[in-house]
């Protein structure tokens, strides 16, 4: 789904001060019925992550952490079965999984002899049964499963969806009888930064030569696309030549402005691929 900047801004404006819940996503779908659920979820997640980055610091002051921890303790003393942490996160407009991390780290600092390592905290967030306090373990679990933008469950889902779309792209390339090298093969040859697929014989798409294809199982907004251009796409272009990026959940139309320089954007696998044959001397 390709959106104009104005269409995207209209959706983004509806997400201001909206909690990251499945109920909010359902309301968004009702407001924009012509947009796919996957596209709206991707935009929803990206906009919320921008909000969290803007407000992250205020939740990590020593005063804020102590206030949250005391509110958590008071809440579970009254009713340990109530979703105290989840409600606290929603009240202060912070991601439930990130709130769970703050409280877990504060708990471990108090009850363990040595400061908790990041790997220990990550392991406990992935498997709350490792947390030595049953009430806190349940509170953390509630935060993880009810967070649709952050946390180990979301990370797992995103990884699986990304892999699924890479497999889809591979199948489409094979269906078109296009010869390619994938990321693993390229790294085995010593390349450190590679697109998902390098075409061994370049193709033409809409009159543009394509040497590589990158799969992105997300919506291409300004923030993410400019970061990808800087960190990935221009590096690919510099090393391998012009290429194609597929944003499977759509992108902002105005971002497709580097075609003449050698980076095309698509929201699906192109249907008008022309295979270029090597000339025989």
UniProtKB/Swiss-Prot annotation:
Establish whether keyword Cell wall biogenesis/degradation is in the entry.
no
Q: In its UniProt record, which GO terms are filed under biological process?
A: erythrocyte differentiation
Q: Which domain of life is it from?
A: Eukaryota
InterPro entries annotated for this entry? CDIN1 (IPR029404)
Question: What Pfam families would the database entry show?
Answer: TPD
Could you confirm whether the keyword 4Fe-4S appears in this record? Answer: no
Where in the cell?
Nucleus; Cytoplasm
Swiss-Prot/TrEMBL keywords: Cytoplasm, Nucleus
GO cellular component labels:
cytoplasm; nucleus
Write out the function statement from the record. Plays a role in erythroid cell differentiation.
What is the protein's name according to its record?
A: CDAN1-interacting nuclease 1
Species assigned in the record: Bos taurus
Taxonomy of origin reads: Eukaryota, Metazoa, Chordata, Craniata, Vertebrata
